[in-house]
Amino acid sequence: MTAVLAPAEDAVRVPWRRAMLALARIEAVRFARHPLTLVAVLLFVSPWVYDLVTGSTDRYPVLHDKVVGLQLSGLFILGGGALVVANLNALRAHRHRTDALYSVLVLPDPWRTAAFLLAPLPYAAGVTLLAAARIGALALLPGAAGRPDPAELALIPVLVALLAATGVLLARLVRSAVVAPLAMFAFAVAAFTVLVAAARGNAALRLLQPVMFGDLPFALPADLVDRPSLRHLGYVAGLAGLVAVAALFRSGARGRPVTVAAVLVSLVAAAAGAAQFHTDDALRRAAVTATDNPAVQQACHRRGDVTYCAFADFTAWIPGWEAVLQGVRRAVPAVTGPPLAVRQRVWAHGYPTGGSTSSSADETGRNTAWERAAEAAGTPAVIPVGTRWGDDTSEAVFAAAAAHRLMTGSAFTPSSMVCGARGALLVWLVGQATPATARGLRKLDAASSGALAFVDDTTFMGMVVPDRDAAPGLSALGRPPAEVGALVTAHWTELTDPATAADRFAALMGVPIAPEQPEEERTVCTA
C-alpha cells in the first residue's frame, strides 16, 4: 500500500507555477485561434481596409482623438469578443462534462483559473501592435494633426484584459455559456446610458467609465486636452486587477498573497480613480488663453501674400486652408485692404456643455476680445478657421469666411446675415472654389431651411444667406465658370455693394430668381 501511495506524494511536489504557465501557453493559442477572436479582429480592422480600398481615409486626422475612437472599438469589438472567448474557455470542462477529471490533476483550481487569466495577455499584446500600427499609419499622412498619448494608446489592451478577466470571473460565478453574451449586452446598454449622462455634464461618469471621452464636440490642441490619461489608465488597470483577484478568490484561492493583491489593486483603482478629479489650474489658464488670445500659443507661416497662424498641432493643415483660400481668390479681382491673414480659433474654455447655453452678451464679449487680440498680434480683419478640417462642409464654411473677407474687407461677426447681391456672390464664390467646397455647399443647402447657413460648430461663428438671395448664386454655378468669373470681375464693385439687390446679380448672370416676398415677410438684413 505504501508503494502505491508514494507516486501520489511525489505528484504533489510537481511545481504548480510551471504547470500553470504551460496551461496558459496552450490556452493562449486556443484563445487566439478561436473563431470569435478572429471575427473580432477582422471587424476591428475592416474600417481601415475599407478606407484603404476606397481611398476614403481621413486626410486630416487628429491623432489624440483617433486614439479615443480606437478605444471605443477596442472596448466593444475586441473586448466584447475577449469576454465571450475567455468565458467559453474557462467553461470548457463544464461544457464537455469533464469537470470530474480535474479532481485527479496536480494543478489546483485557483492555479487553473490563473492560467485562464494569463491566456488573453498575448492577445492583448497583439491588440497593442494593431492599434500602434493604425495610429502610426495615420501619423504618416501629410495632414495629420496632434500627437497620440501613450497612456491612451496603452488603455486599449488594458480594456481587452479587463473584459477577458470579467469573462473568467463570470465562468466561476455562473456555469452557463449564455451569461457572457448577456453580460456584454448589459454592459453596452449601461455604457450608452453613462455616455448620455456624461454628455449632459456629469463629469464623474465621464471619468469613471472605461473609455474617457472629451466633453467638447471638436478637436483641441493636445496640450489643452483635459483627459487625465495616465491616472485613467491606472484606474482601469486597477479594475482589471480587482476582477482577476475576484476570479481567483471565487476559485478557492486564499491566504496572504491573495489578500495583499486584493488590497493593492483596490488601492490602485481607488487612488487613480480619485486622482482623476484633480483640476489643473495651469491647463484651465491655457484654455482661457487659447480661447481669447490664441496668438501667444500659435505659430504663423507666410505663404505668398497671406499669413496663416495655427496651433502647433495643426500647422499641417495650412496647405489645405491655402488651397481653399486661393480657390476663392481666383475669381476675385485685386482688392485693397489689410493684408490677408488666416488665424485658427478654438473655443477651449466656457463652451456650453451638458445642456448649458451661452448668452449673446458672453458671445459678443468673447468675440470682441478675440478680434482685438488678433489685431494686436498684427492680423486685423483676420479670417477665422476652426479645428475641424477635411470634411466638405468645414471647407465650405471656411470658403464663405474667406469670401466675406474679400468682399467686405472685414471679418464677419457671429451670426452675420449676408443679403442681396453680396449673398448671391458669396454663395457662388464658395461653390466654385474647389470640388470639396462645391460638395459642402450642396450639403449645407440640403440641410438649411429659410436661409443657407455657414456655421463653424467649433466656434459658433457663422453667417446666413436668405434662400431667395442664395438661389441665384447656386444657379450661377451651373454656368461656365469663365463666363461668370468675367462678369464678376467686371461688376465687382456693384455686386459687393450692400445696397445692390440679388435681382441685379440674377440679371447679370442670366439666372432666375424667385419673386420678392411681401414686405412684412421679408428677411431683415443686418450685414
Where are these regions (language model features)?
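Aromatic-anchored segments of alpha-helical transmembrane domains
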Residues: V45-L52, L129-R134, F185-V196, S266-Q276
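Secretory targeting signals
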Residues: W48-G81, L88, L117-V178
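Membrane-embedded alpha-helical segments of integral membrane proteins
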Residues: A188-S251
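Pore- or pathway-lining transmembrane helices of multi-pass membrane proteins that form conduits
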Residues: L38-V39, A177-F192
